[in-house]
A protein has these predicted regions:
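Bacterial N-terminal signal peptides that target proteins for export
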Residues: 2-10
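Sec-dependent N-terminal signal peptides
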Residues: 9-17
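Protease-labile, long low-complexity intrinsically disordered regions enriched in Pro/Ser/Thr
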Residues: 27-212
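Intrinsically disordered, low-complexity segments enriched in polar/charged residues with Gly/Pro
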Residues: 6, 26-27
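C-terminal motif of bacterial Sec signal peptides marking the signal peptidase cleavage site
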Residues: 21-24
Length: 212
């Protein structure tokens, strides 16, 4: 049996910690901002510092958030830390008491979740790979519900989770889905989904929160 090195053990412990933090978040009154992940796509290999000013408590981060993340980002999105460890994205999760905006959005049958998200995430500017990672994370929680009330947050979310990136990116896309399961369908004004063109150094974030 292969002996695990210290770095592998730390990664496993961090993953276990994240699982328990999410379970604890589900049991409390706070909303849980689950799996926001941050992708960095510079035009050339670049040293990048990312900081998060969050109106809540960070419960899990990977790699570990130590007064910010400092990584070397490659154009294909690969991130490398000072120890040479590589990552696909920066991950964080937290608890807050933010009241998300449900004044417009979509009421979607659970069985239609995949087709809805594929279309919506494309309109919001995610690549197929980014959308795939979003969908496989949220789909198991949504597909068996009779309906889901889905909204994509803008100012309410970005003010609660302010992102600072150095050097300054040319394009920032932040997709955050607040949603709640429903037994019956409801009427709600539809949102207008748009995205900026992805040009230059691009930063992409996606995440979500199941609201009670």
């Amino acid at each position: 049996m292969r002996k695990l090195d210290r770095k592998s053990v730390m990664v496993i412990l961090m993953a276990v910690s994240c699982v328990f933090s999410f379970a604890g978040c589900q049991e409390k009154m706070e909303e849980c901002d689950a799996k926001p992940v941050i992708y960095l796509y510079p035009e050339s290999k670049t040293d990048v510092t990312v900081k998060l000013d969050y109106a809540g408590e960070l419960t899990c981060t990977y790699p570990e958030y130590r007064d910010g993340w400092k990584v070397t980002a490659s154009p294909d999105g690969t991130l490398t830390d000072a120890d040479g460890q590589t990552y696909n994205y920066l991950y964080w999760e937290g608890e807050n008491s933010v009241s998300y905006d449900f004044s417009s959005g979509y009421c979607v049958a659970g069985s239609d979740t995949v087709s809805f998200l594929e279309d919506a995430l494309q309109q919001l500017g995610l690549t197929r790979q980014e959308a795939n990672e979003f969908i496989v994370y949220w789909l198991p929680l949504m597909k068996e519900n009779p309906y889901n009330l889905i909204t994509f947050q803008s100012d309410v979310y970005t003010q609660a989770a302010q992102l600072s990136v150095d050097p300054t990116p040319d394009t920032v896309i932040r997709v955050f889905m607040a949603w709640k399961p429903l037994k019956d369908a409801v009427e709600i004004p539809a949102q207008d989904l748009t995205a900026p063109d992805r040009t230059g150094f691009t930063v992409v974030e996606w995440g979500g929160s199941q609201v009670r």
